[in-house]
Design a protein with these regions (language model features):
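Bacterial N-terminal signal peptides that target proteins for export
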Residues: 1-7
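C-terminal motif of bacterial Sec signal peptides marking the signal peptidase cleavage site
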Residues: 14-17
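Post-signal peptide N-terminal segment of secreted/secretory-pathway proteins
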Residues: 70-113, 119-120
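An acidic-aromatic
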Residues: 98-149
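N-terminal leader/targeting segments and the immediate start of mature chains
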Residues: 19-74, 80-84, 270-272
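Edge/loop elements at the starts and ends of beta-strands within beta-rich repeat scaffolds
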Residues: 61-69, 80-85, 92-93, 172, ...
Length: 272
């Protein structure tokens, strides 16, 4: 696998690295109903429930909204051995329909093009002239999680992932509010700013205590040039038996522009 292929996988590798060792189950649909269990500390107060409800609703209201989204992203990947890979990702998304991704190297030569829909994952390896087509279950095979188009779009747009509406507790610290939720796969400690209500970080701990793995995502350098609070710099840090770090630096981005999603298969490409 060439370096650009590795860079593409790096965009979802944190999910792979902290995947639970269990069979995939269908994720229940997200609803607006909030199931709240407040961990009692002394005498529970009604204010605790109110604070959790208010901040959960603010997180949901603060999600990036779009019909189409496109961005130019500098991707930096560093593995446990200190090996670094740098690439530029050109990303286009049509909500709930398609993810289109093109990865280029330092010389501006395109190496990988991806086309992901609800049903399929298609990859063009332009360096080795190989075409790969798989069902969308390929995402689940790679990550061993119920990852689908919608959750991958949320990840790329900067929305919370694996954040369950059943919140077990909250905490206040240094101007931040942290909400703790327990889902089918992860315990998610999600932190937002008390003042700006922007998503600051998400700490995902695997429920499988036999093989503890942690993913830490940060959302930095917010700006509101397009009418939405958008994190232009993000980091993904994975700690398992080995460690890896990913940095995503959004150089350009736009919402709701007319986009094309070109993906044609040259006749001389081998099918994988």
């Amino acid at each position: 696998m060439n370096q650009l292929s590795v860079s593409f996988i790096a965009l979802i590798i944190f999910l792979y690295a902290c995947r639970p060792a269990r069979n995939i189950q269908t994720t229940p649909p997200v609803t607006d109903t909030i199931a709240i269990t407040v961990t009692p500390t002394g005498n529970p107060k009604e204010d605790s429930i109110r604070i959790i409800k208010e901040n959960y609703n603010r997180i949901i209201a603060g999600r990036i909204q779009y019909n189409t989204f496109n961005a130019k992203i500098d991707v930096e990947y560093k593995d446990a051995d200190g090996k670094e890979i740098n690439a530029t990702a050109h990303l286009r998304m049509y909500k709930d329909s398609v993810i289109w991704l093109s990865l280029t190297g330092p010389l501006g030569i395109e190496g990988i093009r991806a086309y992901i829909t609800k049903d399929s994952v298609k990859l063009l390896n332009k360096q080795d002239k190989i075409y790969t087509a798989r069902s969308v279950s390929y995402l689940q095979d790679v990550t061993e999680l119920p990852l689908d188009l919608a959750s991958l779009q949320n990840l790329l747009a900067g929305n919370p992932v694996f954040f369950d509406s059943t919140i077990t507790s909250y905490s206040l610290s240094q101007g931040n509010i942290s909400l703790l939720s327990t889902g089918d796969f992860f315990i998610n400690l999600l932190t937002i700013g008390d003042a700006d209500k922007n998503l600051h970080s998400s700490k995902l701990d695997d429920l499988d205590t036999a093989r503890p793995r942690t993913c830490y995502l940060t959302y930095l350098d917010y700006e509101n040039k397009k009418g939405q609070n958008f994190s232009t710099r993000r980091t993904v840090n994975v700690t398992d038996k080995k460690k890896l770090d990913i940095k995503l630096d959004f150089k350009q981005y736009d919402f709701n522009e007319t986009l094309s999603f070109p993906f044609s298969i040259p006749k001389n490409y081998k099918r994988n």
